Amino acid sequence: MSRKKKSRNPGASGAPEFVVTRNRTESDVEGRLRKRAKKRKGLKTGSRNSDAEEQKRQAAAQKRDPRLGSKKKIPLIVEPVKKQTKQERRLSAEQELEMLENDAQLNVLLDRIEAGENLGTGLQKYVDEKLDRIEKLMDQLGLLEPEEDEDFTAPAVKGSRNDDDLLADFDDINFDDYKG
């Protein structure tokens, strides 16, 4: 089969059969718009420089060692550490006691115990340690009252005795028996 040459004639296949005529002003406006769009293909002017500056600033901020350039004075002679006085230690014991009494977790666990709930071994151990520490601190600060024996009971009164009977018993006591 022989080859057929393409032609630009309006009757040829693929080419429009009618010709559009535009007036001069439309063509000029379109041309200017195309030219302007062609000029603005790339990035905005100066964007290369401003982006690079920002990146350099960020990189410099990340790389800079915070220890360099410190204005803090460095002592050349090491001074010996003085021990805390008894009053300072007492103050710190008071602070520790205050912290333990205000411990939210300990308070919640104590509330659970009072409600009759059984705690796990770890939580029970934690509560016991904290309560022991509170007791030691209170004893150290002199806030702990000596415990009285709860098992001690007053001797049972045999019947009702009046003052005359008690006075008679007192008079009958022989104090010579108690001399050593």
UniProtKB/Swiss-Prot annotation:
Pfam families: YihI. The lineage of its organism: Bacteria, Pseudomonadati, Pseudomonadota, Gammaproteobacteria, Vibrionales. Interacts with Der. Residues 23-32, 50-68, 80-90 have a biased composition (Basic and acidic residues). GO terms for molecular function: GTPase activator activity. It comes from Vibrio campbellii (strain ATCC BAA-1116). This is Der GTPase-activating protein YihI. A GTPase-activating protein (GAP) that modifies Der/EngA GTPase function. May play a role in ribosome biogenesis. Residues 165-180 have a biased composition (Acidic residues). Keywords: GTPase activation, Ribosome biogenesis. Residues 33-43 have a biased composition (Basic residues). InterPro entries: YihI. NCBIfam families: PRK05244.1-1. GO terms for biological process: ribosome biogenesis. Residues 1-90, 145-180 are annotated as: Disordered. Belongs to the YihI family. It comes from the Bacteria.
